[in-house]
Amino acid sequence: MRKGLRATAARCGLGLGYLLQMLVLPALALLSASGTGSAAQDDEFFHELPETFPSDPPEPLPHFLIEPEEAYIVKNKPVNLYCKASPATQIYFKCNSEWVHQKDHVVDERVDETSGLIVREVSIEISRQQVEELFGPEDYWCQCVAWSSAGTTKSRKAYVRIAYLRKTFEQEPLGKEVSLEQEVLLQCRPPEGIPVAEVEWLKNEDIIDPAEDRNFYITIDHNLIIKQARLSDTANYTCVAKNIVAKRKSTTATVIVYVNGGWSTWTEWSVCNSRCGRGYQKRTRTCTNPAPLNGGAFCEGQSVQKIACTTLCPVDGRWTSWSKWSTCGTECTHWRRRECTAPAPKNGGKDCDGLVLQSKNCTDGLCMQAAPDSDDVALYVGIVIAVTVCLAITVVVALFVYRKNHRDFESDIIDSSALNGGFQPVNIKAARQDLLAVPPDLTSAAAMYRGPVYALHDVSDKIPMTNSPILDPLPNLKIKVYNSSGAVTPQDDLAEFSSKLSPQMTQSLLENEALNLKNQSLARQTDPSCTAFGTFNSLGGHLIIPNSGVSLLIPAGAIPQGRVYEMYVTVHRKENMRPPMEDSQTLLTPVVSCGPPGALLTRPVILTLHHCADPSTEDWKIQLKNQAVQGQWEDVVVVGEENFTTPCYIQLDAEACHILTENLSTYALVGQSTTKAAAKRLKLAIFGPLCCSSLEYSIRVYCLDDTQDALKEVLQLERQMGGQLLEEPKALHFKGSIHNLRLSIHDIAHSLWKSKLLAKYQEIPFYHIWSGSQRNLHCTFTLERLSLNTVELVCKLCVRQVEGEGQIFQLNCTVSEEPTGIDLPLLDPASTITTVTGPSAFSIPLPIRQKLCSSLDAPQTRGHDWRMLAHKLNLDRYLNYFATKSSPTGVILDLWEAQNFPDGNLSMLAAVLEEMGRHETVVSLAAEGQY
C-alpha cells in the first residue's frame, strides 16, 4: 500500500508530504468540526499543524492572486469575500481574529498547468447580522490565511460595513438674488453615509459639468461657485448626494440673476418751446441701458431735464420822422431824409418799406437850365485822356516789376540747390518715429539735455537713438543732466555708454525691452543690495533681500518637474518706477519686481513685503497694483473684495503683506484713505556728521515710510555721506487729516550754540509725506557753535503732526574733528544670505507636509479639515481662494511658512494640530526633533 502511494505520487510529480497533507488535514478538520465545532478549538487545531513535512521538496510561500476587498452590506443582502492563492495546500478565512468554520467556506481547487502548483480559491458569505453583532471600536474585518509546505501567508484585511445614507443634509443650499456678473456661492454638505456620498449639482434637473461650462466650479468640499452670474444662470439648483444605498436631493435653491436698470444717454436739447419771450428746453433719457430685469432696481434720477430759455422777439423796423427840406439847390430841387431806426429791425424783424431820401422841385418847375459852355466840354475831355494814359503806364510798370521778381525767385531756388551740392532732400522714415533724436550740435563743447535722470542700466530703453549712420555719437561727449531741482549732474558714464552702442544694437534692445529688461540680466545689473537671485527647480526655495523686509517663497512643486528657473526679486528705488498717486492715495510698500516674467508656475509663489499702513483701523481701501509690460499700472485686487476671478490673494499682517500669485511681475500696495482717521506709520531717523571741523553742524531729520527698505536706503546714503545715527529711530502715526508735519528744535545752550533757522519751526507739506512717492524726505537744522572748543551738543527735537501725534528726541552727542568708524547697528551684517534652496528653506519636513495634505484636503463631517486649519492660523479671510486649489492645505502651509520665516514657529503649529485632534502629526513633528 505504501509503495503504491509512493508510486502514484511519483507519477503525478507530487511529494509524499503533500499526499499526507491532502489526506490528514481534511480528516483532522472534519474531526474538529464534528467534535465541539467551536472557533477556539479550530484555532488550537490549526496551531498544532506542523509547518512543514520532512519529505516535502522546497516550495515557495503562498502568493495571493486575489485578496479580499472591502464590501458594503446594502439593506439585508449578504456579501461574499473571495480569496485565491498559489501554491496553497489549505486556505481559510479569519474574521475579527477568529477562524471561520470550515463549513462556511466554499473551496475550489485546481492545478496550474503552467507551474504545476496547486491553486486554491475560497469564498465566504457575511450577513448583516454578523456585522451588527460585533461590538468594539473597530469595524468588522476578515483576512485570508493560506498554507503551503514553506509556511503561511496572510492577506490584507477587508472591512465589511453596513452601507447607509442619512436623509437629512448637514447643510442645504439657500436661494439668492444676485446682480449680473456677481460671484455666487451655494453651499452643500451631504448627509452622513457609508460609503461617503458623492455629490453632484443639478440646474433645472440637468447635471452641471464644470468641464463643459467653465463658469461653474465645484470646490473640494462640494460647494458650487458661479464665477460670474449670467442671465442664463437664473435657475433652480439642487444638491444631489448618492452612494450605493440611496440617492438624496436637497431642497431646491432658486438663484435669480437680476439686472439693475441703467440710463441711456441724454437726447439733444429741444428747441425753445416759446417763439417769443421766456420758455423752456428739455431733454430725455430712458432706463433701457440696460432695462431692469428679474426684479432689478429701476434707474435712480430724473428721466426728463428742463432748463429755462428766452427767445428774443422779432422787432420790425419803423421810419423816423422826415427831416426838414433842404435849401433849394442850383438844380431847383431840395430833399429830405428819414432813417429806419424807430426802432431799427432786429431779431429777424422786417425792414422798413419805402425811400430813405425824397426830393422835389422847389420852384414849381419855373427853374431855368443854361446850356453847357464849349470850354467846359474841352476841359472834361482833356481830363479823361490824361487819366487813361496814366492808368496804361501804371499797368505796364506793374507788369515789368512782377516779371522781374519772378525771375529772381527762380534764381534763388537754383542757387540753393547748388549750395546743397546737388543732393535732393531725403525723407528718412525710421521703423519707429519716436526713436528719432535731434542730431547733436557738433560746434558745441557740451550738449544740454533736459529731462528725467536715468540710471546707467536703463540707458538702453530710455535714450532715443537714430538709425542713420551719418549721426554717429560723439566720442567723449559731456552730457549735463538737469534734474527737477535745477542741480547739474555730470553724466560722463552715460555718454560713454551710449557712444559704444551701435544703432542696430540700440534698436534691438528697444524692440525686446518687454522680454529682456525684465529677466535675470536686469536683476544682475541693479544694485546688489536691492536684489536677490538664484537658480531653483521643483524642490523650491527662498529668495531674501537682506534688511529690506522683501522675500520670495517658491514652494516645492511650484516649478514644473524637470524645469530649472533663474529667479530674482528686486526693489525699485527710482521715483519714475512708482505708480501715480491720486490725492487720497498713498504708497504703502516699496515697488518690487519678481521674475522671470511669464514663467510657468503650477502653484502660487508668495511675495512678502513690509508695509507702513496701520491696519488697526477700517478706514483704508487697500489695493494691489502691478505694472504691465507697456509700463502702465493696473489694478489687480482690492483687499476684502476678492472673488473667484481675482488672480492674487493678499494676507495683510500687522507689518507685512504676503501676496500669493502665479504671475511674476512688478507689484506695489497702494492705500486710499476713506476717512481722515486712516493712518500710516512713519519712521523718524536723525543723523549728524561723523566729524565736523567747522563751526557749523547740520542735523538731518528723515521722515520715512516705516518699512525696512526705506530705512535701509537712508542708512546706506548716510554711510556714503559720512553721517552717523544720533538717536534710535522712532515711529509716528501720521493721519490722513491733511495737516502738515512740523519739526522744531528746543533747549539749545545759547551760550555755546545758535540756530541759523530764522523761523521757530519747519514744516513738511502733508501731500509730500502722504503720497509716499518722494524718497529720503528730510529737513535740516543747521547750528553754529560759537567756539571750536565746544564739543558737546545737547538739545531736543520735536516732530509732530499738526493736531496729531508727535515724538520728542533728546540729543546728547559729541562733535568730533577726527573721523571715526561708522557704526550703523540697524544694518545687520549677518543678514547676507539671499538664497536658500531645497528642503532646508522650509520649516515643515516634506513627509510631514505630505501627510498633513493627504489628511486635511478631504472635507470632514466635523470640519476637522483644511478649513479649521485656516481658521486656527487666522488665514480664513477668504476661504474660496484656497478651495480652488488642488491642495488647499498645501497653499495654507506655504503661507504659514512665509509668515514665520526664518524662525518657523513649529510649536504653535503643533499646538494647532493638537487642538484639531491630529495627534499622529504632532508625534511625527516631535520625532523629527522640529520643536
Swiss-Prot record:
Receptor for netrin required for axon guidance. Mediates axon repulsion of neuronal growth cones in the developing nervous system upon ligand binding. NTN1/Netrin-1 binding might cause dissociation of UNC5C from polymerized TUBB3 in microtubules and thereby lead to increased microtubule dynamics and axon repulsion. Axon repulsion in growth cones may also be caused by its association with DCC that may trigger signaling for repulsion. Might also collaborate with DSCAM in NTN1-mediated axon repulsion independently of DCC. Also involved in corticospinal tract axon guidance independently of DCC. Glycans are attached at residues 236, 361. Phosphorylated on different cytoplasmic tyrosine residues. Phosphorylation of Tyr-568 leads to an interaction with PTPN11 phosphatase, suggesting that its activity is regulated by phosphorylation/dephosphorylation. Tyrosine phosphorylation is netrin-dependent. Proteolytically cleaved by caspases during apoptosis. The cleavage does not take place when the receptor is associated with netrin ligand. Its cleavage by caspases is required to induce apoptosis. Residues 850-929 form the Death domain. This is Netrin receptor UNC5C. Expressed in cortical and cerebellar neurons, including cells of the external and internal granular layer and of the Purkinje cell layer (at protein level). Mainly expressed in regions of differentiating neurons. Highly expressed in brain and lung. Expressed in the cerebellum and the neurons of the hippocampus, with enrichment in neurons of the CA3 hippocampal pyramidal layer. Weakly expressed in testis, ovary, spleen, thymus and bladder. Expressed at very low level in kidney, intestine and salivary gland. Pfam families: Death, I-set, TSP_1, UPA, ZU5. The gene is Unc5c. Residues 1-40 form the signal peptide. The modification Phosphoserine is found at residue 502. Disulfide bonds join 83-144, 95-142, 188-239, 272-309, 276-313, 287-299, 328-362, 332-367, 340-352. Keywords: Apoptosis, Cell membrane, Cell projection, Developmental protein, Disulfide bond, Glycoprotein, Immunoglobulin domain, Membrane, Phosphoprotein, Receptor, Repeat, Signal, Synapse, Synaptosome, Transmembrane, Transmembrane helix. The record marks 415-416 as: Cleavage. Residues 161-256 form the Ig-like C2-type domain. InterPro entries: DEATH-like_dom_sf (IPR011029), Death_dom (IPR000488), Death_UNC5C (IPR042154), Ig-like_dom (IPR007110), Ig-like_dom_sf (IPR036179), Ig-like_fold (IPR013783), Ig_I-set (IPR013098), Ig_sub (IPR003599). Residues 62-159 form the Ig-like domain. Residues 694-712 are annotated as: Interaction with DCC. One of its GO terms (biological process) is positive regulation of developmental process. Belongs to the unc-5 family. It is found in: Cell membrane; Cell surface; Synapse, Synaptosome; Cell projection, Dendrite. Gene3D superfamilies: 2.60.220.30, Death Domain, Fas (1.10.533.10), Immunoglobulins (2.60.40.10), Thrombospondin type-1 (TSP1) repeat (2.20.100.10).
